[in-house]
Every structure is written in structure tokens, then in C-alpha cells.
Amino acid sequence: ISMDSMSYFSSVANDYGYNNIFTRWFDKMESTFTKKKNVKVCVIGLSGSGNSKNIVSSLDGARDKGWDSILISGKKSICLPEGIDELCIDCESFHTAELVTLMLFYQLVHDLGHECPTIDKEIRRKSKAPKALRG
């Protein structure tokens, strides 16, 4: 879900509650995903605490649809249902967890073969740099 969809967020939160924002979108998009053959859906949730109700419930709903579900968290979740994978940063500072989570998310998107302009630009920049400056 794009964060520029504020009217969607507002209307769903008003009608169904904040905890259902993502699950309602998944319900709407499910037919789009299932119409295409050989499409595998992976839902990645990001939560500093690991216990954000709207994130955990969306991952649970995605898992119920047969989609892969992964939680990247700053702290170990105490409420994550079985069958949902968790990658826990487990650090004291939320700032550190947020930075690491963001880097992992972009790398995962890139490694799965999706376009990630920020990473692609950095790879091109480093490949043009003199060998001694490449990191």
C-alpha cells in the first residue's frame, strides 16, 4: 500500500478500525493477485515493537490467504501467530532497528528481483567509481 493513499487509510480506519487498514486492502486485492497465474504473494510487515496489532493481523490474514508472510521487527513479537516468519533485529534502540529494518527491506525487495531505484542507483554509482573507492 502506498503511503500516499491517505484517503484510503482515513476511510477504512473510520469505517472498520485502524487495525483493519491492511487486511481490508488485501481483501480488495486478492482477486487481482489470484487472476494471474504463477503469482506468488509475499507480505512483509515492519514493526518496531513486533506487536503492532494492524501489522500482526494483516500478516495473519495474508497467511490465511496462502500468501507468504514475514515480520521484520525491532523486538521479538509476543503475539505473532504460528506460520509467520519473523526476522527480529532485537536491539535496545528503536532508531537502530528502524534503520536496519529499512536496509533489510530494500535489500529483500532488490534480491527478489523487483526494481528498487535507490539500490540500483547506488550499484551503478559504485561500479563507476575507481576501484580503490568501491566499498
Which residue stretches match the model-derived regions?
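Glycine-rich phosphate/diphosphate-binding loops and the adjacent beta-loop-alpha structural elements
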Residues: K131-G135
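Glycine-rich phosphate-binding loops that contact phosphosugars or nucleotide phosphates
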Residues: I1-K126, P130
